[in-house]
């Protein structure tokens, strides 16, 4: 047979060991005792195994924490003797998971062994007959549940109590000339003035007197009004002591030697004031335009540098070389071509290596040209040694130069080389002060124009030229 399971466990408790029922037969009692002991053994083994697993898990967590502590201690010991400044960055959030793991009971998932099916045993012995006398004797040794709860006492009535038996009429029950039942609620009233209900509680408080008035009323005293406290935050630096210490203290334990603080920390932060944003100075940037060579009809022309402000004139632009063969020149151009050829003799020795390709490799530095100009002015003696001429002579010379230029322009054709030569001559005249671009000037202006005549022109940039160009110039 199967033992009867008693429900004597608490709420949430998984295990429940059955008790041995009384008045059992011998074989039945032995079988239930064996089942109960086996059940208790299974429960004990399950409980202790779960406790051991939880202890092992806690031990592993503690070991991991100990390893982290030892690692942090080793890092601290390593940087303890260092004299270098160390920056420590703190995380914006606390290093913890967003959702904490809830505590789990060690009995989670446990099954009650009592729910398993057990083998059934058949007992051949018969039950003993019921003995009432023996049952009464057992009440002396076993506790018996008796209802010991006390019944609530009758509440005290507010009236006179129960109705007497000698009342024969309604007028004897009610108070004279009223509708009040004194046996139900006891009141004191004047039958002619009206009923005023008074209970036992009111009767008890009626005998008490009022308390004495406070001193502020009896002695006419007034309490001093306290001023409200100001809880506004007013920052103040207070008295800061001035400490005179050296700026650098070497060989101090635990103090970094590569960290310097500036004494000028700017305006203080207390008391708080609206910070004004300083105005930044305006910067004007000038973008220099790059020189872009222009190729027209296979002619390489170098752009002249921007003219500097007067009085120092800009240096002359480098002469351009033509890759095509030179056409035959007119007789009046022979002398000018010979002069240009003599200027190119210095660079003709290096012109046999390569032909003209691309932009010139060397460009005359404008600063060196200005330095050469100033040096030439110093050598000429300045304005003091200049020979002044009259204005009429200068005007006559300019008229003659204009007439000669007009004659040359009409006599010369549209030859490319002649046009280039004319532009070169006009530029040199404009630099020397003989051209029409100079305008009429009086006083020191004419002296400068005459001084510029004695200044030699800047040497042209060295450009490699082919054999054909050299032969053309020599011819």
Curated annotation (Swiss-Prot):
Question: Where in the chain is the Glycyl lysine isopeptide (Lys-Gly) (interchain with G-Cter in ubiquitin) cross-link?
Answer: 219
Q: Compositionally biased, Acidic residues: which spans? A: 466-475
Ranges of biased composition (kind: Polar residues) = 347-356
Q: Where is this region: Required for WASH complex assembly?
A: 1-54
Stretches for region Disordered: 300-475
Q: In which tissues is it expressed?
A: Ubiquitously expressed.
Residue ranges of the region described as VCA = 357-475
Listed GO cellular component terms?
autophagosome; centriole; centrosome; cytosol; early endosome; early endosome membrane; endosome; late endosome
Q: From which domain of life does this come?
A: Eukaryota
| Molecular function terms, GO-annotated | actin binding; alpha-tubulin binding; gamma-tubulin binding; low-density lipoprotein particle receptor binding; phosphatidylinositol 3-kinase inhibitor activity
Query: What does the record say about PTM?
Result: Ubiquitinated at Lys-219 via 'Lys-63'-linked ubiquitin chains by the TRIM27:MAGEL2 E3 ubiquitin ligase complex, leading to promote endosomal F-actin assembly.
Task: State where composition is biased (Pro residues).
Answer: 303-318
Where does the record place the region WHD1?
A: 1-167
Q: What does this protein do?
A: Acts as a component of the WASH core complex that functions as a nucleation-promoting factor (NPF) at the surface of endosomes, where it recruits and activates the Arp2/3 complex to induce actin polymerization, playing a key role in the fission of tubules that serve as transport intermediates during endosome sorting. Regulates the trafficking of endosomal alpha5beta1 integrin to the plasma membrane and involved in invasive cell migration.
- Copy the domain comment: The VCA (verprolin, cofilin, acidic) domain promotes actin polymerization by the Arp2/3 complex in vitro.
Q: Which family does it belong to?
A: Belongs to the WASH1 family.
**PANTHER family, from UniProt?**
CXYORF1, WAS PROTEIN FAMILY HOMOLOG 2-RELATED
What is the protein's quaternary organization?
Component of the WASH core complex also described as WASH regulatory complex SHRC composed of WASHC1, WASHC2, WASHC3, WASHC4 and WASHC5. The WASH core complex associates with the F-actin-capping protein dimer (formed by CAPZA1, CAPZA2 or CAPZA3 and CAPZB) in a transient or substoichiometric manner which was initially described as WASH complex. Interacts (via WHD1 region) with WASHC2; the interaction is direct. Interacts with BECN1; WASHC1 and AMBRA1 can competitively interact with BECN1. Interacts with BLOC1S2; may associate with the BLOC-1 complex.
* Name this polypeptide is given: WASH complex subunit 1
